[in-house]
Design a protein with these regions (language model features):
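Exposed, interaction-prone assembly regions rather than primary DNA-binding/catalytic cores
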Residues: 119-126
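Basic, amphipathic "hinge/linker" alpha-helix immediately C-terminal to the N-terminal HTH DNA-binding motif
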Residues: 82-106
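N-terminal helix-turn-helix DNA-binding core of bacterial DNA-binding proteins
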Residues: 15-62, 89, 97
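Long, low-complexity, charged/polar intrinsically disordered regions in eukaryotic proteins
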Residues: 1-11
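Residues within the DNA-recognition helix of helix-turn-helix
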Residues: 66
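Alpha-helical residues within the helix-turn-helix
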Residues: 53, 71-72
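Alpha-helical linker/hinge and terminal dimerization helices associated
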Residues: 35, 73, 102-117
Length: 126
């Protein structure tokens, strides 16, 4: 795995700064739809309709916006095949695969602590 060294200022890499590039990227990818898209793609290459079908509750518009954002940030690769009608496929890039590991750990954490969180919510509401 080849990681490119960030050449910007330390301020740009500081998540705590509201105007930093790191905060902008974090804000982009740390939303429920982006995380679910990353988990859904996994190590597969899928067409738009397959991703849409696999993620319950996501709208066509939200999937489009999030795939574009993930592509813009270099986490998803979009391939268009010159067929009629055009065939478009999506796959995670190397950095996207790296983030997938973190997303997968978050999914595992959620499953592991569901009971505890459900109980805490009950106490909070009750």
């Amino acid at each position: 795995m080849v990681t490119k060294q960030f050449s910007g200022s330390p301020d740009e890499a500081d998540l705590r700064r509201a105007d930093s590039l790191a905060r902008e990227i974090f804000s982009d990818v740390a939303n429920k739809w982006a995380l679910l898209i990353i988990e859904t793609l996994g190590d597969r290459t899928l067409r738009f309709s397959e991703v849409l079908k696999d993620i319950d509750g996501i709208s066509h518009k939200m999937l489009t916006q999030n795939l574009r954002m993930l592509e813009r940030n270099g986490l998803v690769e979009r391939t268009v095949y010159p067929t009629v009608p055009p065939r478009v496929e999506y796959t995670l890039t190397e950095p996207g695969q790296g983030l997938r590991g973190t997303v997968h750990l978050m999914c595992d954490w959620t499953q592991q602590h569901l009971g505890h969180i459900e109980e805490a919510r009950g106490r909070f509401s009750g």
